[in-house]
């Protein structure tokens, strides 16, 4: 198999080649951009193809002035010769810059924002609403509050103990000064530990979703309008035979918002995408946004997607993943009526076996890494009936058809 070429060049990207399948991918709330996901996809595609005895050429990531997407192409090699058509084109849809804009690094600002967030969560009914749908997710939402609350108690107890112990020996002023220095050191240590454990990342994601839930989504809505226009233009200029819109983690509700925006576009009816576009959500947390009563724009998006003719939508989650709403109907989560057959199609898969996590502690301590297992390939015996990259490389992925 040919190795993936270095990132950032145009070689290996051909604009007018016939494309069998184009994937538009939305990452979760992640400041890492296309370069990270290019390396992830390239490595996993290579591993999956090797397992199948296939030879692929994974092209370089296309350098382009368009800030909306980054693209790379995958072509089959047969007897050392490249196929004429492109087997797969991956388009990374950029909203990572919005994640970076909503990634404050000042601890004091984050703590101050937490007052309103956890006021709503604990006292405003958020915890109960989410707890009815997914108890593990509800407890996960409390984790930043519990971590920093316990660390604060530890810090104050240690600092007060040292200050009190030193007072008879060195006086009140010295004892207080040493206690203050210790408190500051422990606070800094706690913050670094929280970042290492992913607590701060989780809290930033909660903060962003809460802001969207308060209808503070103008920047994201503007981006979605631009992305919808870009997708329609691409599918008019060089249409792919099959189109897949994929959202991972928080990217799942962005995916739903974008799919609805596409349907609102005047060019939608002439694009032919209603016959070619399919939706795939991985490790979704749609209900994290849907439970907010002020998220009326998102509720309208869901209602539009439920209207006939519906876009085929497969939702893949796992009960082992405490950061997703495993098997939760996004429409039921916010009380929206959804007539007819269940929508989206919900599929639960096991993930713990992929990492040989055999007990609760091992499972709980690997949640952030496990949440990315949807974006990794696996041996068939461990895949739990779903392999994202095997699906992308299939000639006819029946499981995402109506």
Regions found by a protein language model. Give the residues of each.
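Serine-dependent carboxylesterase/thioesterase catalytic core
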Residues: 22-23, 27-45, 213-323
């Amino acid at each position: 198999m040919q190795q993936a070429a270095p990132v950032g060049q145009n070689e290996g990207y051909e604009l007018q080649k016939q494309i069998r399948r184009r994937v538009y991918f939305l990452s979760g709330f992640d400041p890492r951009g296309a370069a990270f996901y290019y390396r992830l996809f390239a490595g996993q595609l290579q591993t999956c193809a090797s397992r199948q005895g296939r030879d692929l050429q994974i092209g370089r990531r296309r350098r382009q002035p368009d800030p909306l997407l980054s693209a790379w192409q995958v072509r089959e090699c047969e007897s050392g010769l490249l196929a004429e058509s492109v087997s797969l084109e991956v388009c990374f849809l950029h909203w990572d810059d919005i994640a970076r804009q909503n990634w404050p690094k000042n601890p004091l600002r984050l703590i101050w924002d937490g007052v309103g967030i956890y006021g709503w969560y604990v006292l405003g009914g958020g915890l109960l609403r989410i707890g009815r749908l997914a108890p593990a997710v509800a407890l996960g939402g409390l984790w930043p509050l519990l971590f920093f609350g316990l660390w604060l108690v530890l810090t104050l107890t240690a600092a007060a103990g040292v200050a009190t112990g030193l007072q008879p020996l060195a006086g009140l002023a010295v004892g207080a000064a040493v206690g203050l220095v210790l408190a500051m050191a422990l606070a800094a240590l706690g913050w670094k530990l929280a970042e290492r454990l992913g607590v701060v990342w989780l809290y930033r994601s909660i903060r962003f979703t809460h802001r969207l839930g308060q209808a503070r989504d103008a920047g994201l809505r503007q981006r979605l309008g631009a992305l919808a226009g870009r997708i329609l233009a691409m599918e008019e200029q060089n249409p792919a035979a099959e189109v897949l819109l994929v959202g991972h983690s928080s990217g799942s509700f962005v995916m739903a918002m974008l799919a609805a925006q596409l349907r609102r576009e005047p060019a939608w009816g002439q694009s032919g995408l209603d016959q070619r576009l399919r939706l795939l959500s991985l490790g979704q947390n749609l209900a994290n946004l849907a439970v907010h009563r002020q998220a009326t724009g998102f509720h309208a998006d869901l209602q539009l997607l439920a209207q006939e003719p519906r876009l085929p939508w497969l939702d893949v989650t796992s009960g082992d993943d405490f950061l997703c709403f495993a098997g939760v109907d996004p429409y039921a989560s916010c009380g929206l009526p959804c007539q007819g057959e269940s929508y989206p199609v919900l599929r639960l898969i096991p993930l713990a076996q992929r990492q040989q996590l055999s007990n609760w502690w091992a499972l709980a301590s690997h949640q952030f890494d496990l949440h990315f297992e949807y974006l990794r390939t696996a041996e068939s015996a461990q895949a739990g009936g779903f392999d994202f990259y095997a699906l992308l490389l299939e000639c006819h992925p029946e499981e995402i058809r109506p």
